[in-house]
C-alpha cells in the first residue's frame, strides 16, 4: 500500500490511491478512496496511478473477475457519481422502481411522433458472452434516439431500454389514431354503399 492511509491485503494487491483499499489477488485500487476486491480488476486505476484528491468521475467500488494480467475485467463497478455497471445478467426477485415524479424534472415537453423513427429499428437475435439474446443494436438506436445511448471509457455503447417505453407508448397511440381513421373511412364507405343499394332498389 503506497497511498496515504491506504490498505492492501491478499496476494500482490496494490492500493496506491490515497485512502484506498485493495484486497484479493492482483487487485489494484489507485483511485482516491476507492475499494477494490477480487481478481485482476480493469477499473479503479486513475491516470496518475495514485490519485490524491476526490473526483466524482473516479471509481468508488469494484469487484474484479479477470483471468490474468492480459485479461482484466470487472463483474461490478460503482462510480462516485452513482453510475453503476454490472457486466453480466442481473436477476431481481422484486420490482425495479425508477424515480419519475414530475417535481424532479424540468423543461418537460410532450414527446412527438415516434412511429417513423421506431420503424427504422430492427429487433435482433444475437450471441453475447456465450449466451443467446434478443435486443437492439446501440448504433441503430443512436441514429434515431441519441439520448437513449451512452458511451463508456472504452467507447462501448449502451442502450437505455427503459427509455424506449415512452417511445413505444407514443408509437402505439399514433397507430391507434390511424386505425380509427381507417375505421371511420370504412364506415363511411359502407354507408355510401347502402345508400347506393337503396337507390338502385328504388329504381327497380
Regions found by a protein language model. Give the residues of each.
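C-terminal intramolecular chaperone/autoprocessing and neck/assembly modules of extracellular spikes
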Residues: 82-162, 171, 175-204
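Periodic small-residue-enriched repeat registers in elongated scaffold domains
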Residues: 1-87
Amino acid at each position: 500500500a503506497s497511498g496515504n492511509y491506504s490498505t492492501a491485503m491478499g496476494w500482490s494487491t496494490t492500493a496506491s490511491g490515497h485512502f484506498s483499499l485493495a484486497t484479493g489477488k492482483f487487485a489494484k485500487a489507485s483511485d482516491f478512496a476507492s475499494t477494490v476486491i477480487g481478481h485482476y480488476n480493469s477499473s479503479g486505476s486513475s491516470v496518475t496511478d495514485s490519485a490524491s484528491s476526490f473526483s466524482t468521475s473516479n471509481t468508488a467500488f469494484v469487484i474484479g473477475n479477470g483471468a490474468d494480467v492480459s485479461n482484466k475485467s470487472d463483474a461490478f463497478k460503482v462510480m462516485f457519481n452513482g453510475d453503476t455497471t454490472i457486466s453480466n445478467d442481473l436477476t431481481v426477485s422484486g420490482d425495479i422502481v425508477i424515480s419519475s415524479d414530475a417535481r424532479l424534472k424540468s423543461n418537460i415537453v410532450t414527446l412527438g411522433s415516434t412511429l417513423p423513427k421506431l420503424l427504422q429499428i430492427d429487433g435482433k437475435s444475437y450471441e453475447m458472452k456465450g449466451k443467446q439474446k434478443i435486443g437492439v443494436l446501440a448504433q441503430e438506436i443512436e441514429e434515431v434516439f441519441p439520448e437513449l445511448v451512452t458511451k463508456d471509457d472504452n467507447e462501448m455503447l449502451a442502450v437505455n431500454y427503459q427509455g424506449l417505453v415512452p417511445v413505444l407508448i407514443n408509437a402505439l397511440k399514433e397507430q391507434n389514431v390511424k386505425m380509427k381513421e381507417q375505421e371511420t373511412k370504412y364506415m363511411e364507405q359502407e354507408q355510401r354503399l347502402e345508400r347506393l343499394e337503396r337507390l338502385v332498389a328504388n329504381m327497380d
